[in-house]
């Protein structure tokens, strides 16, 4: 079965390892195709060594609104079809972290007074409000002033890292990541970075995070929901 062939300890499949650590369904697991569905994040993780018509028909039948795969050919094929009208499509690199977590009292649940600022600096107000309501949005405060923020996404990854412009290049980004790894240590953590986000990639490299050899390809309509 294909699932048994994946190196789940590799950064390439950290997203699948996260799905397996929670509530999920195995939709398909053959020698050349795998479809997992997370009951938590509602994402379909699809892997295949052979893109056949039966696999495509299965995906059309499932009609996923949130799909991820490391197969770039499948990504391109699904990007061009009309049966699954994905609104958003992008590729990212995936990282796993060494033992750098450090408890930091500066990181705490985002204060409600700072929620409008976060909404203004993130692409989706609805998703930010969901993260906030589920205590998955953390602020980094120095002398009660918000320096930056980070999120624990519903798929298990940490991301949406943001440092206010006036506080950049002062080491806060690294401090926020390390603090988040400690704060969310009860689940397998990883991060995903859009392939052209060179600033974030350099940050992960400076933290000696292990980088995937493949790209994680995302297709989605309305994104995560709780």
Segments predicted by a language model, with ranges:
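A structural microfeature
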Residues: 146-148, 173, 213
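Conserved acetyl-CoA-binding loop-helix of GNAT-fold acetyltransferases
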Residues: 51-59, 163, 169-183, 198-206
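Conserved active-site alpha-helix within GNAT-family acetyltransferase domains
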Residues: 73-84, 195-213
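A conserved beta-strand-loop-helix scaffold within acyl/acetyltransferase catalytic domains
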Residues: 38, 127-165
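Conserved catalytic-core motifs of GNAT/GCN5-like acyltransferases
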Residues: 85-98, 192, 210-226
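N-terminal charged segments
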Residues: 1-68, 72-77, 119-123, 127-132
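A short beta-loop-alpha structural element at the N-terminal edge
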Residues: 1-4, 106-117
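Conserved GNAT acetyl-CoA-binding A-motif
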Residues: 61-73, 184-196, 215
């Amino acid at each position: 079965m294909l699932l048994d062939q994946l190196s789940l300890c590799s950064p390439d499949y950290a997203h699948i390892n996260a799905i397996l650590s929670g509530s999920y369904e195995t939709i398909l697991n053959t020698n050349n195709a795998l479809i997992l569905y997370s009951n938590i994040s509602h994402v379909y993780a699809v892997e295949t060594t052979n893109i056949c018509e039966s696999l495509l028909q299965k995906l059309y039948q499932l009609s996923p609104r949130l799909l991820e795969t490391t197969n770039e050919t499948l990504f391109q094929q699904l990007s061009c079809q009309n049966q699954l009208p994905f609104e958003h499509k992008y590729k990212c690199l995936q990282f796993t972290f060494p033992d750098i977590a450090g408890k930091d009292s500066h990181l705490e649940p985002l204060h409600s007074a700072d929620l409008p600022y976060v909404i203004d600096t993130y692409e989706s107000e609805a998703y930010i409000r969901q993260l906030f309501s589920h205590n998955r949005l953390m602020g980094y405060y120095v002398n009660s002033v918000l320096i930056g923020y980070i999120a624990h996404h519903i798929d298990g990854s940490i991301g949406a890292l943001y440092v206010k412009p006036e506080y950049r290049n002062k080491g806060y980004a690294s401090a926020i990541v390390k603090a988040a790894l400690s704060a969310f240590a009860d689940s397998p953590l990883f991060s995903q970075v859009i392939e052209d986000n060179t600033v974030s990639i350099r940050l992960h490299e400076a933290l000696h995070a292990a980088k995937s050899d493949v790209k994680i390809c995302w297709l989605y309509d309305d994104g995560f929901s709780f």
